[in-house]
């Protein structure tokens, strides 16, 4: 998914994670251990028409980088890159917390990236 800003992407990722966690997995015939992994990166992408799928798509190195995050993210978590975390830190009243998780090897031998676990900032928390 491509959105215009990091805050919208963070809201979307955390809402997807919350919604998934509330699914009645057993009622749906799914294993209780099933979890969702989400990854995010912030950078320019290039729209282009995909003639195979007959629709618009996005391409570029930042799309490839993002695709290498999800496979190494623990289930039930949203991992984001340092570029994404930095974009979220810009507002005067940041709504999100990005906890540094270390340098994590990316999927498919893409190298290593500094990863952050994304969460919402509690409205009662004073910092």
Question: PLM features: residue spans?
Answer:
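Short, charged, solvent-exposed linker or helix-capping segments at domain edges/interfaces
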Residues: 125-127
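Catalytic beta-strand-to-alpha-helix segment of the class III nucleotidyl cyclase homology domain
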Residues: 2-123
């Amino acid at each position: 998914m491509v959105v215009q800003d990091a805050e919208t992407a963070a809201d979307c990722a955390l809402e997807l994670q919350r919604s998934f966690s509330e699914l009645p997995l057993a009622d749906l015939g799914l294993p209780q251990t099933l979890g969702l992994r989400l990854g995010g990166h912030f950078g320019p992408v290039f729209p282009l028409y995909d003639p195979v799928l007959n629709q618009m798509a996005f391409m570029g190195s930042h799309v490839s980088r993002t695709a290498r995050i999800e496979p190494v993210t623990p289930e039930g978590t949203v991992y984001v890159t340092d570029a994404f975390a930095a974009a979220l830190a810009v507002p005067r009243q940041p709504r999100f917390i990005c906890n540094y998780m270390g340098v994590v090897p990316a999927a498919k031998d893409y190298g290593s990236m500094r990863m952050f676990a994304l969460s919402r900032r509690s409205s009662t928390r004073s910092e």
